[in-house]
Amino acid sequence: MSEFLPFSRPAMGVEELAAVKEVLESGWITTGPKNQALEQAFCQLTGNQHAIAVSSATAGMHITLMALKIGKGDEVITPSLTWVSTLNMISLLGATPVMVDVDRDTLMVTPEAIESAITPRTKAIIPVHYAGAPADIDAIRAIGERYGIAVIEDAAHAVGTYYKGRHIGAKGTAIFSFHAIKNITCAEGGLIVTDNENLARQLRMLKFHGLGVDAYDRQTWGRAPQAEVLTPGYKYNLTDINAAIALTQLVKLEHLNTRRREIAQQYQQALAALPFQPLSLPAWPHVHAWHLFIIRVDEQRCGISRDALMEALKERGIGTGLHFRAAHTQKYYRERFPTLSLPNTEWNSERICSLPLFPDMTTADADHVITALQQLAGQ
């Protein structure tokens, strides 16, 4: 236990090394057959019709908003308690992010908060499946259908998350992340699933310069026909090196998430006797992927502030995370929306702390965290 226990560590093994070696020796290392296999695997996992692999979930959000023609004068509803890339992409396209509050105990954006924020300018709704649990997506999607507004699910935390018996992303449009701390990772990467064929076609163009084909298609066809720009696009394709790692991780998903679940249960049992408050679980039927294990550290209740707790854990060789600092409290958005008040978001943003949670953690590692929390409670 002398080594520092990080907040997260990717679970990499000989299988990932072998997958990378195979790609390196194949003669084709950029976007190619491994991308195609990854996309097919995600269609099988989710049950959706189309999958588009991209260089990051942020890239996926960017081109999805672009494909939906989100721009100047439009509004997009999203929680403030999310990673800032969503707000940034909305803003960079000239649209206005309309930040709404979340449930105080699940941190999920609610259908009621979404519906109350709709105006004639609303073009999209971006709910977040938070920490590995699902938002009430049926109710949110029903609002989108009623008002004719697109719903883009932020599923960055939700590889392996199920809602009412179906994997997140089973219908509609959802964006997953393969960042280094996610449930499956390839260092950097993302993937969009959708049941909209026209949207899928636009996304494939936008992710690769606006061309009608990608580099692998061009090589396979002997560069005939010559590719041409159909619409201005970006360089957001995923390499086959990354895709091969993600595919290997996907095979291990059930094992990886089972281990996360075991650690989460160990935390839950110990926290029942401590003042630190874990998140509540959603009321609807679901399978939690346990991307994060979050506690709320209320100084009056716990005898220690969140920041002091994080520092004290660090001194004991334990890393933590903060998911997330509310976007509307950060400089750019604070100055842009100076009167915005989101009480539940703000209360949680000042108190949330993510404990170490990753598949290679041992029971002794989790016990080390629990012992430290027991020592610090009431200080």
UniProtKB/Swiss-Prot annotation:
Its cofactor is pyridoxal 5'-phosphate. InterPro entries: ArnB_NH2Trfase, DegT/StrS_aminotransferase, PyrdxlP-dep_Trfase, PyrdxlP-dep_Trfase_major, PyrdxlP-dep_Trfase_small. It catalyses: UDP-4-amino-4-deoxy-beta-L-arabinose + 2-oxoglutarate = UDP-beta-L-threo-pentopyranos-4-ulose + L-glutamate. Keywords: Aminotransferase, Antibiotic resistance, Lipid A biosynthesis, Lipid biosynthesis, Lipid metabolism, Lipopolysaccharide biosynthesis, Pyridoxal phosphate, Transferase. GO terms for molecular function: pyridoxal phosphate binding; UDP-4-amino-4-deoxy-L-arabinose aminotransferase. Gene3D superfamilies: Aspartate Aminotransferase, domain 1, Type I PLP-dependent aspartate aminotransferase-like (Major domain). One of its GO terms (cellular component) is membrane. CDD domains: AHBA_syn (cd00616). It is an enzyme of class 2 (transferase). Its EC number is 2.6.1.87. Pfam families: DegT_DnrJ_EryC1 (PF01041). The modification N6-(pyridoxal phosphate)lysine is found at residue 182. One of its GO terms (biological process) is response to antibiotic. Pathway: Nucleotide-sugar biosynthesis; UDP-4-deoxy-4-formamido-beta-L-arabinose biosynthesis; UDP-4-deoxy-4-formamido-beta-L-arabinose from UDP-alpha-D-glucuronate: step 2/3; Bacterial outer membrane biogenesis; lipopolysaccharide biosynthesis. Homodimer. Catalyzes the conversion of UDP-4-keto-arabinose (UDP-Ara4O) to UDP-4-amino-4-deoxy-L-arabinose (UDP-L-Ara4N). The modified arabinose is attached to lipid A and is required for resistance to polymyxin and cationic antimicrobial peptides. Belongs to the DegT/DnrJ/EryC1 family. ArnB subfamily. This is UDP-4-amino-4-deoxy-L-arabinose--oxoglutarate aminotransferase. It comes from Escherichia coli O9:H4 (strain HS).
